[in-house]
Amino acid sequence: MTIDHQHIFVGGQWIAPKSTQRSNILNASTEELVGSVPKCNNEDMDRAVAAAREAMRSLAWAGLDGKGRAQHLRRFADAVERRGQQLARSVSLQNGMPINVADQLESAFVVSLLRYYASLAENLVEEEARPSPTGSTTLVRRDPVGVVGAIIPWNFPVALSIFKIAPALAAGCAVVVKPSSGTVLDSYVLAEAAAEAGLPPGVINWVPGDRGIGSHLVSHPGVDKVAFTGSTSAGRIIAEACARLLRPVTLELGGKSAAIVLEDADLDALIRSLPMSSVLNNGQACFSCTRILAPAGRYDEVVDAIAGAVSAYSVGDALDRATVVGPMASAAHRDSVQRYIELGTGEARLVVGGGRTSQDRGWFVQPTVFADVDNRSRIAREEIFGPVLSIIRYEGEDEAVEIANDSEYGLGGTVWSTDHDHAVTIARRMETGTVGINGYMPDLNAPFGGVKSSGMGRELGPESIGAYQRYKSVYLLG
């Protein structure tokens, strides 16, 4: 059964798009048609931005305090929760995320995130009186930045939408969302939840389409801030556009994270964590630790342990509960990953995988492990975004840190050791926005983001609300 959407959600209503073009959505595991949606044009995007601007002027939204916004966020969370299974299944069909992962990260985690920001909104301090050294008083306000243009990637389409929507709404902004063209069906489920929750018209608008309308959104005169998650190359283009406009932007971009395995590491713990820390979502996670740094004295042991684990992973349909690694999100991306694997066979020693799977249909690649990898090689330096691990030898902890930091990226990382305090000492030396000790899982109460070519700004945590606010000082002089 296919799902055919004819309308878009703009201004709190389901309206017919001006564009007559359509986009087909395929099942990543079977290549079968699962749905179609409008492919919107710039005129459709203009209507969405206008609706968001009207919401910023309307007392139904602009007139609410933090407690009022919190009530809307909680109702939205409840409506999303009722659609949890539908959301998870939708994502798994479209991008190949194993259903067990989608249940957690594209459903349960998203609901928790909305409720977390509802709590923050409820206790938000939006104005404070500060005494001046001159004897007067100044009111310092934190106002919403205005209309936010949010551009969403295909790898975690629900979670990364809510990473932006929840803090923006908590701050009092209105949002125009441009989902990835490959994962659109889930955005319709979120829009249905927003409608059921009774969010004021124009507070959230969803406009599906290609990169052209995304560019139009970024440079639109009615947009006050841009939030983007995606590739570093696209992020640079967006950063340049926002710089010309002096428009604030949050960018969460690529990564090539390192896992530093120390001499005293518990290898069993490392192996248990690999599906989350290194192969999550079939390797299609920006923070994945795909460079495994192993000490020379335990190098062969680490290689054998990882090879044994990865070779046993069940590869199959994303909706199969037994699947550990599903397909890539598209045929083009599968081909890109496969090219990197072929490149790697000339740069390093292939230990596991290296080819396509036995499936007749679907965009699958074999989980692959390379050993004897030089950190200067392309497979160690470029983001592959697939289930491909590179194991790199180091001679001492200083060299391990040096190798980990020798990357244009700096988003994630892990340190593996039975000495917790020492692991934290190593983590402090890593040039990256986030580091996990003996595992990796972003914390919704802590800022998430990268350094260097992995982006600018932070999402998650209370800090994220500040990204959607601007300061105003009111001098009380008489």
From Swiss-Prot:
Top-rank taxon: Bacteria
Induction comment: By the monoterpene alpha-phellandrene, but not by acetate.
Keywords attached to this entry: NAD, Oxidoreductase
SUPFAM superfamilies xrefs: ALDH-like (SSF53720)
Active site (catalytic residues): 252, 286
Site (Transition state stabilizer): 155
Protein name: Geranial dehydrogenase
Species this chain originates from: Castellaniella defragrans (strain DSM 12143 / CCUG 39792 / 65Phen)
Gene: geoB
